[in-house]
A protein has these predicted regions:
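Conserved nucleotide-sugar donor-binding catalytic segment
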Residues: 1-84
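C-terminal subregions of glycosyltransferases and related glycan-biosynthesis enzymes
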Residues: 63-159
Length: 159
């Protein structure tokens, strides 16, 4: 198996690139670090974040599995997505807030789930703008504050 690169804790916080079907490791790693049974969504990401803090994580670019979502999959439940992101933030808050790129990536992901619950991601856009005050992020925050962001998001999802 060719290993392409090492993945750091901060890289994994910024981009969730793991699924349970693709994690390979020694049994002792998984006996030491367990799934958080209370995590309603992103259990693979939560587990990987815990593992990467203690063990070296590498990835291989080659596609090794096909993944299919079933109709009743938890990935189709946006409320669980919002709660899962909240729990990840509570656990990794300091690391997330230490890097504006991680803040933006993390809260954009959370905002997408908020929009799917038919709410505006005002708080998420506010945090993004606070940590990365660009004109674009101000406009996104303003759109969310005015209640328009979710409509634009949902229109974009249809195309």
């Amino acid at each position: 198996m060719k290993i392409d690169a090492y993945i750091s804790y901060k890289q994994l916080l910024k981009y969730n690139c793991t699924t349970t079907q693709t994690i390979i490791g020694k049994a002792e790693c998984f006996k030491d670090i367990l799934f958080d049974e209370n995590q309603p969504r992103f259990t693979d990401w939560a587990l990987s974040l815990d593992l990467v803090k203690k063990y070296k994580f590498y990835y291989q670019q080659a596609v090794l599995v096909d993944v299919y979502q079933q109709k009743d999959s938890i990935t189709k439940n946006p409320q669980k997505g919002v709660r899962g992101m909240e729990m990840l933030f509570e656990k990794h808050k300091d690391a997330i807030l230490s890097d504006k790129e991680i803040v933006e990536s993390f809260f954009k992901k959370k905002a997408s789930f908020v929009c799917k619950t038919d709410k505006n991601p005002k708080e998420e856009m506010k945090i993004i703008f606070k940590y990365n005050p660009t004109a674009g992020n101000f406009i996104k925050y303003l759109l969310a504050a005015l209640g328009v962001y979710k409509y634009i998001f949902n229109i974009k999802q249809k195309f």
